[in-house]
UniProtKB/Swiss-Prot annotation:
The gene is cdhB1. It holds the Pfam family CO_dh. It comes from Methanosarcina acetivorans (strain ATCC 35395 / DSM 2834 / JCM 12185 / C2A). GO terms for biological process: methanogenesis, from acetate. Coiled coil: none annotated. Belongs to the CdhB family. Part of a complex that catalyzes the reversible cleavage of acetyl-CoA, allowing growth on acetate as sole source of carbon and energy. The alpha-epsilon subcomponent functions as a carbon monoxide dehydrogenase. The precise role of the epsilon subunit is unclear; it may have a stabilizing role within the alpha(2)epsilon(2) component and/or be involved in electron transfer to FAD during a potential FAD-mediated CO oxidation. Keywords: Methanogenesis. InterPro entries: CdhB, DHS-like_NAD/FAD-binding_dom. This is Acetyl-CoA decarbonylase/synthase complex subunit epsilon 1.
Length: 170
């Protein structure tokens, strides 16, 4: 019988790359060290508990918000720096190093995503993963494999606790 399990050294650099799981502590450090972070939020942030945490993250770390879908309406009276943009267009713009950003001060180095359906945000982050050096951190309830780093699959209670821990560490 031929042993086909030996010599498993890789000689290529291609293949599927997936995100690394991240703890709230590490995510907070990465967000704090980012030169130009952007918080990208989706329509799932219409949930009042999640919306409250989005506002706290933005205010605590002084991060502008890219509001996608119908999320801008809920942020209008929260005294945060939020701009509307289509999520797919933002994903496209983030791959362009010459894009001026939402505020005209240049492209971002780190994008934090929260409040999206898993199948949707994975498609948006696919371009950023494959065509840019952008660091993306998914602080979603589900594991997002096209992000650079992501929380694992969490229950709703654990997700809220992880977000609270992240806010405390920012």
């Amino acid at each position: 019988m031929v042993d086909t399990a030996k010599n498993t050294k890789l000689f290529t650099s291609y293949g599927v790359s997936t995100s690394k799981t991240v703890t709230p502590e590490i995510a907070a450090k990465l967000i704090s060290k980012a030169k130009r972070p952007l918080l990208m939020v989706g329509t799932l942030t219409l949930d009042p508990e999640l919306l409250d945490r989005v506002v706290k993250i933005s205010k605590t770390a002084n991060i502008p918000i890219a509001a996608t879908g119908s999320s801008l309406a809920s942020l209008a009276d929260k005294d945060v720096d939020a701009e509307y943009i289509n999520a797919h267009m933002l994903g496209f713009y983030l791959t362009d190093p010459n894009w001026p950003g939402l505020d005209g001060n240049g492209n971002y180095d780190t994008v934090i995503v929260l409040g999206f359906k898993k199948f949707y945000i994975n498609q948006v982050l696919s371009a950023a993963k494959n065509f840019s050096n952008l660091k993306t951190i998914a602080i979603e309830r589900g594991y997002i494999q096209n992000a650079t780093m992501s929380f694992g699959n969490l229950s709703k209670a654990d997700h809220y606790a992880a977000l609270d821990e992240l806010i405390d560490l920012l």
